[in-house]
Amino acid sequence: MNKRILFLYSLPKQKSQILRCEAAFKAILRKFRQTGIFSYLQIDTSPTCREKMVEILKSSIKISNAVIFYGDIQSANQDALFIKEVFGEVTQERFLAGRCICSPLCDEISSIKDDAISESTVYHLSQIKKAVSLAVSEAKKKKHNLTVCTQSESGASRLIFREFEYALGKERHISASHIDFDEMLLCSMGHYPFPDVVLTTQAISRTASLLLASLQKMPTGYSCWHTESTKIYLREIFPFEQISCAADASLLLVFSAVLKNELFLKSAGDWLKRSVSLAYEKCEQTHCAAFLDEVICEINKPIRNRKEKHNDSED
């Protein structure tokens, strides 16, 4: 039986990225109830938002296993009491809670400018070209339009969309349009058709978790995740070794276990342990090590059990 995992990602006070309305919370929780696998919330600790979240969570399902990761230590401190309050009242089941400090490592793709592309971004750009080429090829076969979701304000996103325009060229039956994260939320709530293609850059956690909460079928494959109408080209653009913060690796670690994808799990887990280890030295948050070990042990269980059963059958 799959574990139910509620992923809460706490951001600094970036109001434009906060899920502000009650309808958004309810829509995501409704999808979580349907799939029983995954959900996504961003936490705003303002009094109004707290009241709405407490009310909604109290009336929501019992959560068998919630894994909470923080991308920002200041936000983590602010939100800790709120999360404890909510989960203490919502569920009596055991849940894992902890804090992953942002890694000092930084992916340079997040600072790409149109007029200043460093040599270190060449690899990323080549991956973008591959992903775009693959997406356009698929669009030609199925004769559908492309919707590209990127970070609208980042240089990397502009490069991605420019590459799409170039690749499409004279293909008159294919068009590309651009949406940002706020519009993606509306797609997940059913207000707009879901994108045909989603390209992510450095914000894996915000993008992938929102998408996973919206998928009708479990993703499959290694370099692409397939759904009935959506392809998420993640691996091509964002190799695991270039993940920019521990929260992103944490997300990959969690849903890799849910999807029982050993390859993803090992890549994300290895990176997370290495990255967070650097953060320990800088922030002296050594208590995180025990928590991280507990999380890895916990989410590894279904994979280990499955292997043991497989070996037994061979004997």
Regions found by a protein language model. Name each.
Residues 16, 22-51, 63:
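Structural/interface elements that position substrates and couple domains in central-metabolism enzymes
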